[in-house]
A protein has these predicted regions:
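HIT superfamily nucleotide-processing domains
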Residues: 1-120
Length: 120
């Protein structure tokens, strides 16, 4: 496996477990990826230590984005497997800032990955 994430030199945060970069194909201002240093494809292959280290980066990045961009909310997401939409098979967590009126109706949030399932 040769991860394109490891080639990115500009890192926002880093700890012994992982690092944070801006998403090259951001869906909103401030969209970040939290990435483990160890290359593995699936979140469910993470060790307990990795989950803790990545979660620490996730919270640190959330605070940074709140200060820098003042979003109104966040989506946190992981695509686990090809049929869940994963295209880079180096596990990563999306932290997507959301802004009032960035979509007509945000109801359902991540449920909208399946068209028509966001309303309930």
């Amino acid at each position: 496996m040769s991860s394109p994430f490891l080639e990115v030199k500009e890192r926002i945060f880093e700890n012994s477990i992982g690092f944070v970069i801006y998403d090259k194909f951001a869906v909103s201002k401030g969209h970040c990826l939290i990435i483990p240093k160890r290359e593995y494809p699936d979140y469910f292959d993470s060790t307990d230590e990795e989950i803790i280290g990545l979660n620490n980066l996730l919270f640190q990045t959330r605070e940074y984005l709140k200060q820098k961009y003042n979003p109104d909310g966040f989506n946190v997401g992981i695509n686990s497997g090809e049929y869940a939409g994963q295209t880079v098979f180096h596990m990563h967590i999306h932290l997507i800032p959301r802004y009032k009126n960035d979509v007509d109706n945000p109801r359902g949030g991540v449920r909208n990955v399946i068209p028509g399932k966001g309303d309930y």
